[in-house]
């Protein structure tokens, strides 16, 4: 699958996770509704599904990975930033096939597209601190 299709999968995952985080609906329902309503012809749908289910299933674990590196309480984190960080931390901790720098750079780009004005700097700061602990020898 092309890198652009994976990038689109991540973009879609941010949107779907944002919806899930706010609605607290079942993740399978969020996935179904998202795929039914969005144009996903240029999306790696299998990767989108993996990100969505992986982040939802491991959200407590992923939140635990980010907490020590947050400059504020987890509850004060914006929903977009939380979704972006969860995706990156999922890729870093559960997807060894995704290079270290790719996971971080993709998260920064997602934060630029979907986040508040300086959220990409915040995301970069958190991942810069967390990533070496998650993948100590796999930069």
UniProtKB/Swiss-Prot annotation:
GO MF annotation list: RNA binding
Keywords noted in UniProt: RNA-binding, Transcription, Transcription antitermination, Transcription regulation
Gene3D superfamilies: NusB-like
UniProt-listed PANTHER family: ANTITERMINATION NUSB DOMAIN-CONTAINING PROTEIN (PTHR11078:SF3), N UTILIZATION SUBSTANCE PROTEIN B-RELATED (PTHR11078)
Family: Belongs to the NusB family.
Matching HAMAP family: NusB
Protein name as annotated: Transcription antitermination protein NusB
Organism name: Cronobacter sakazakii (strain ATCC BAA-894)
């Amino acid at each position: 699958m092309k890198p652009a299709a994976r990038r689109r999968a991540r973009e879609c995952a941010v949107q779907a996770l944002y919806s899930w985080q706010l609605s607290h609906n079942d993740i399978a329902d969020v996935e179904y509704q998202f795929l039914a309503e969005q144009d996903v012809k240029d999306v790696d749908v299998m990767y989108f599904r993996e990100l969505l289910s992986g982040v939802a299933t491991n959200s407590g674990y992923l939140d635990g990975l980010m907490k020590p590196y947050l400059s504020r309480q987890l509850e004060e984190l914006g929903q977009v930033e939380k979704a972006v960080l969860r995706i990156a931390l999922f890729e870093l901790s559960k997807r060894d096939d995704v290079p270290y720098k790719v996971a971080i750079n993709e998260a920064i780009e997602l934060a630029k597209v979907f986040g508040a004005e300086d959220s990409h700097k915040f995301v970069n700061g958190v991942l810069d601190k967390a990533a070496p602990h998650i993948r100590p020898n796999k930069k």
